[in-house]
Amino acid sequence: MLNYDCDVCVAGNGPSGMIAARQLALAGLSVIIIGSPNHQMHKFGETLAGAAIRLLLKLGLKELVETLLNTSNDNNSFPPKVTGNMAFWGTEQASITDAIHDPYGLGLRIDRQRFDTLLKQYIQLKNITHLNANITNLTKQNGLWKITLDGKMLITSKWIIDATGRSAKILKLLGVQRYRGAPLVALYRTCVPEKNISLNKTIISSNESGWLYAGKISEEKWVLGFHTLPKFAFNLRNHASHWDDIINKKSGITDLLGQLGLSADIYAHDVRTTWSPENSGEGWVACGDALLAFDPIAGQGLFNAIYTAIKASEHILSAEQKITLESNYLKEFQKIIKVYEHRRYSLYKEEQRWLDSAFWKVHQYYQ
């Protein structure tokens, strides 16, 4: 069995795990990042909000941001900037928000797989080791974690970070309970609009059974996502013809984009709100979606990944250096949860047209 020793073991090699690892490595700690060899979730284009871009710049990742700004998705030359939102929510009339009024600036529509690859390139430091394996056992002996990988490798580490995304593998191994919000499934597929293909705004549109998301991801393609309850998602995925009903039911999308040439492939993801009441303990800390996974309506996925990674690394460094932080990680996290849940509830409550709908009954309940 191969043996490794490090100060911090980061489980998960998504944006949150990589940012946390970089911050700790820059502070002089030895870090091992464990990626899952079987992780194959399809990642469509995603919006990197202006606030998230500001965090990356604050971390000194200016070159990464410039690379994203100056090159395109899928080798196509189109401006990746997102100029705002158009929402058909609570009414058939569009509510338009221009990103120019956002104090953090314009967002970027990024290829998530490419973003993750670029981020990995920009965090290459000599005291970061990358491994791809499954964590099969986790124990603690004499204040140190013993982390077994595929029964073939053993890592001894003082700290472990759960950055495994919604699966929260480390929290589960530790027996930490997680809150699960109202059921929500997202079905994603690409499409080619008939008109206004160059529109650089995100479109959100509610209907009786859920809500639609549409955004440009390349010179010719858009991504279309429908967020609904599991039973409706199952029927929609297995009867693709029903998409026409979803799109054409006064969604505003047909008026804007014309007829959509829909791809055959449909990808389903569980995107309900999940969070852990505990974000850290003796020798462990969680960040990213493992800690708090937002409902996509919040549009804060990548910001949350980066921000909580920074806070998780600060938590470890303060413990190692015996420094008292200005803000307590747990208290700050609890405040974020409270604000998020209130805003989410308020947003869903704005839709008053389908009060008897199963979807809106579930999501307008304040838990």
Language model: regions and residue ranges:
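A conserved beta-strand/loop capping segment in the N-terminal third of enzymes
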Residues: K58-F115
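C-terminal helical "tail/cap" subdomain of flavin- and related membrane-associated enzymes
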Residues: E314-Q367
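FAD/FMN-dependent oxidoreductases across multiple families
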Residues: F78, L154, F234-S313, Q321-I323, ...
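Glycine-rich, N-terminal phosphate-binding loop of Rossmann-like dinucleotide-binding domains
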Residues: N13, T164-G165, F294
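Predominantly flavin-linked oxidoreductase catalytic cores and closely associated redox partners
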Residues: Y122-I253
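N-terminal Rossmann-fold NAD(P) dinucleotide-binding loop
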Residues: G17
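Glycine-rich FAD pyrophosphate-binding loop
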Residues: C9-N13, A25-E46
